[in-house]
């Protein structure tokens, strides 16, 4: 029934296998790729174009179902919802690797679906997903004539490179690099780096490329065994349209000579509309006209750059656009910056929060909490378009994650800066490299906030014009240079090293020589931008702004955590309500207090410490009147505990009625003189000097009455321990009428001199 074909290799100690013929046989190409115990089903389906289009409708989806990790989805419906950021990012990595390899002019709809079947939590799925995609394309019959593979590279503390590091190895790695390539060239790079040098990063790329070769050989052998060869493809002949476009060469050159983006866009629109109207009247297909115009413009601009040795906006190849920087542009925010580079502008705003504001990420490795968030927004008005603002798409998620990777290596440890940090980058206008403007703006905004980052970070996008054996590398590319060029190579880092890389190609790969030159030229540009940034703000604020919540951290014993939280959170809620602060308690006993002011934070700290401090006989504490009965006052101690006080302990004088001295809500200092059997403290107000808060040293009222002191104590104790249903008068002890046994002060609690307090 099944005609199964399977090929496998031992790839650096782990088995990598490709299999087809058993699952999803109705797809044009279907491959199950296994790497370790991680298994992914990749399917490719092609739909013949029914109408001419001027782009490649390629759709790549990586899907991680919960069952692959042995979990049931949360929520009411218990089904997977929209793609997670991780799924989106993996989909983008695959798309960016294979898109340049389809033949020019091929516009059939291609659907690539990567289903994660099982995940071993050791081998990350990015690598096998790309390998399976290339293998499925190779046997699908689609005109895909290149064989590439992907690999991940890590780097340990001794600068030893690690091939496809495990999840645990990657957590300790100085480098998180994913690259794809063929036998001779590099096609795509995505990386987060902990300030490594250009040389180290280049060596890591070479290391990864070297270890791609066995996989490329495996895919070729697998495809040859299956025998379904890619079909040949001949692009639509547009030579007649191209010949007509030569009449408009001068018009295009004049339009592209305008250095201001808005003027250039308007001039180009006039030329394009003129061409479209003229050629449509001549009976040419509108889609083919549009495709031919794009191809013509691409050749024209590249030729202009080579011929004139200057770029569209008259800059030199390595020249950076004019930069304007402002910090603290929005004073009432926690931190802000406006970064403008040419016609690209990013408004970046930060907000600080508590641990409760952390993002809970449902990742394939399990739930985790993220205390640093960076969100990138690209509204239509940034490029002069009139359309609705929608939810963030793949591009916005990808650009935000790239900026996150660039900033993450320089952030302080949570123990050093206990805030949750959210950064939002609003792109106000764009003419290329808006993600790198986000990196620069984020660095400035964080320093304006007072976040102690290790060093400022800047980013730059590099471009490429390649013609046979000649190439030109461009620094700080415009949007048109990105669109019409061969490469978009984004590099971010500090003055000491690289923190993030992202390279996308429009052609089937570049050499190590071009990668090396691009990195070196990017370093020069990055240092120039950092110099401009440092002239505005070079280090973080020494203190956060007045309206930013304060954080006070301290530790309590682990065995006190339960008491600090209280039954169903009663104690911690009480302290938060009384102090107007937020309190978080970690498993290690660390208590973090967030309050508007340092005073409130200190007050909350004291309340929390008081609430877990054991009450001791003889201690003087604050008390508040909660309820007054005929002879008993119910008190709330300011540590959240309850207490009681007899009428005889209210004042150092005869008291007919408690209300004559105290009212509900009054606060005062009280002495703990004993405890009931249930632990409720008995208190005395008269034994404390209310002015000084110290033990009263003077003569107490009626202390000369020697007889009846024991009876008085019994009366005191019996009154506290009365049941509510007992009749007060029937149980009232008889006051002694006469007799003095001695002149010593009465002892409370146990009649033992070692435990009594005076």
From Swiss-Prot:
Chain intervals with Low complexity compositional bias: 711-721
Chain segments carrying region Disordered: 707-758
Any Gene Ontology CC annotation: cytosol
Domain of life: Bacteria
Span of domain S1 motif: 618-686
InterPro entries, per database record: ExoRNase_PH_dom1, ExoRNase_PH_dom2, ExoRNase_PH_dom2_sf, KH_dom, KH_dom_type_1, KH_dom_type_1_sf, NA-bd_OB-fold, PNPase
Alphabetically ordered keywords of this record: Cytoplasm, Magnesium, Metal-binding, Nucleotidyltransferase, RNA-binding, Transferase
Catalysed reactions, semicolon-separated: RNA(n+1) + phosphate = RNA(n) + a ribonucleoside 5'-diphosphate
Binding locations of Mg(2+): 482, 488
Enzyme Commission number(s): 2.7.7.8
Entry-linked Pfam families: KH_1, PNPase, RNase_PH, RNase_PH_C, S1
GO molecular function: 3'-5'-RNA exonuclease activity; magnesium ion binding; polyribonucleotide nucleotidyltransferase activity; RNA binding
Residues covered by the KH domain: 549-608
Entry's Gene Ontology BP terms: mRNA catabolic process; RNA processing
Enzyme class, spelled out: transferase
Cofactor(s) of this protein: Mg(2+)
Cellular location(s): Cytoplasm
Family to which this protein belongs: Belongs to the polyribonucleotide nucleotidyltransferase family.
Entry function: Involved in mRNA degradation. Catalyzes the phosphorolysis of single-stranded polyribonucleotides processively in the 3'- to 5'-direction.
Record protein name field: Polyribonucleotide nucleotidyltransferase
Protein source organism: Wolbachia pipientis subsp. Culex pipiens (strain wPip)
Gene encoding the protein: pnp
């Amino acid at each position: 029934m099944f005609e199964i074909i399977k090929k496998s290799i031992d790839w650096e100690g782990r088995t990598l296998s490709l299999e087809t013929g058993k699952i999803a046989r109705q797809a044009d190409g279907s491959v199950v790729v296994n790497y370790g115990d991680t298994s992914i089903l990749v399917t490719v389906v092609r739909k013949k174009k029914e109408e001419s289009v001027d782009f490649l409708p390629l759709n790549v989806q990586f899907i991680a179902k919960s069952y692959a990790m042995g979990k049931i989805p949360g929520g009411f419906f218990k089904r997977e919802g929209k793609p997670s950021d991780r799924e989106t990012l993996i989909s983008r990595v695959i798309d960016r690797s294979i898109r340049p390899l389809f033949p020019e002019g091929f516009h059939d709809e291609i659907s690539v679906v990567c289903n994660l079947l099982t995940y071993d939590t050791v081998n990350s799925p990015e690598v096998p997903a790309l390998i399976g995609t290339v293998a499925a394309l190779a046997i699908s019959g689609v005109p895909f004539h290149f064989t590439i593979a992907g690999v991940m590279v890590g780097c340990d503390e001794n600068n030893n490179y690690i091939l496809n590091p495990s999840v645990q190895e990657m957590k300790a790695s100085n480098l998180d690099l994913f690259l794809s390539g063929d036998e001779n060239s590099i096609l795509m790079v995505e990386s987060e780096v902990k300030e490594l040098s250009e040389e180290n990063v280049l060596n890591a790329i070479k290391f990864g490329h070297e270890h791609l070769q066995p996989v490329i050989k495996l895919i070729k052998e697998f495809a040859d065994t299956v025998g379904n060869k890619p079909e040949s493809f001949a692009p639509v002949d547009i030579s007649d349209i191209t010949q007509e476009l030569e009449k408009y060469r001068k018009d295009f050159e004049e339009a592209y000579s305008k250095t201001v983006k808005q003027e250039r866009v308007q001039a180009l629109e006039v030329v394009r509309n003129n061409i479209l109207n003229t050629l449509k009247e001549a009976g040419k297909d509108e889609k083919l006209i549009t495709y031919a115009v794009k191809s013509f413009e691409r050749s024209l601009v590249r030729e202009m750059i080579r011929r004139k040795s200057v770029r569209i906006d008259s800059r030199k190849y390595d020249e950076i656009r004019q930069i304007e920087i402002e910090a603290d542009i929005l004073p009432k925010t926690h931190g802000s910056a406006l970064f403008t580079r040419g016609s690209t502008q990013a408004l970046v705003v930060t907000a600080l929060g508590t641990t409760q504001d952390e993002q809970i990420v449902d990742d394939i490795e399990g739930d985790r909490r993220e205390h640093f968030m960076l969100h990138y927004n690209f509204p239509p008005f940034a490029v002069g378009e009139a359309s609705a603002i929608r939810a963030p798409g793949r591009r916005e998620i990808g650009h935000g994650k790239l900026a996150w990777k660039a900033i993450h290596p320089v952030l302080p440890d949570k123990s050093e800066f206990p805030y949750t940090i959210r950064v939002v980058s609003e792109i106000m206008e764009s003419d290329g490299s808006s993600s790198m403007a986000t990196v620069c703006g984020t660095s400035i905004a964080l320093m304006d906030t007072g976040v102690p980052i290790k060093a400022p970070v800047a980013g730059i996008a590099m471009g490429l014009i390649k013609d046979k054996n000649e190439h030109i590398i461009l620094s700080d590319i415009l949007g048109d240079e990105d669109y019409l060029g061969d490469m978009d190579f984004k590099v971010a880092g500090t003055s000491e090293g690289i923190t993030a890389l992202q390279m996308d190609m429009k052609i089937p790969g570049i050499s190590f020589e071009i990668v090396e030159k691009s990195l070196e030229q990017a370093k020069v540009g990055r240092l120039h931008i950092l110099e401009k940034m440092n002239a505005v703000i070079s280090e973080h604020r020494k203190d956060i702004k007045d309206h930013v919540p304060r954080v006070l951290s301290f530790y309590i014993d682990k065995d006190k955590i339960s008491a600090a939280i209280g039954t169903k959170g009663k104690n911690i809620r009480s302290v938060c309500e009384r102090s107007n602060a937020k309190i978080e308690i970690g498993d290690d006993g660390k208590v973090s207090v967030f309050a508007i002011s340092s005073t409130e934070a200190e007050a909350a700290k004291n309340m929390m410490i008081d609430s877990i401090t054991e009450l001791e006989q003889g201690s003087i504490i604050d008390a508040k009147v909660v309820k007054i009965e005929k002879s008993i006052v119910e008190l709330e101690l300011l540590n959240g505990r309850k207490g009681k006080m007899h009428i005889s302990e209210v004042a150092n004088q005869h008291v007919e009625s408690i209300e004559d001295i105290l009212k509900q809500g009054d606060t005062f200092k009280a002495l703990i003189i004993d405890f009931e059997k249930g632990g409720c403290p008995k208190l005395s107000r008269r034994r404390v000097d209310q002015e000084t808060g110290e033990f009263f040293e003077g003569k107490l009222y009626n202390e000369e009455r020697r007889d009846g002191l024991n009876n008085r104590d019994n009366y005191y104790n019996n009154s506290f321990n009365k049941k509510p249903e007992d009749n007060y008068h029937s149980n009232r002890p008889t006051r002694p009428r006469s007799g003095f046994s001695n002149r010593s002060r009465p002892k409370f609690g146990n009649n033992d001199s070692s435990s009594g307090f005076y």
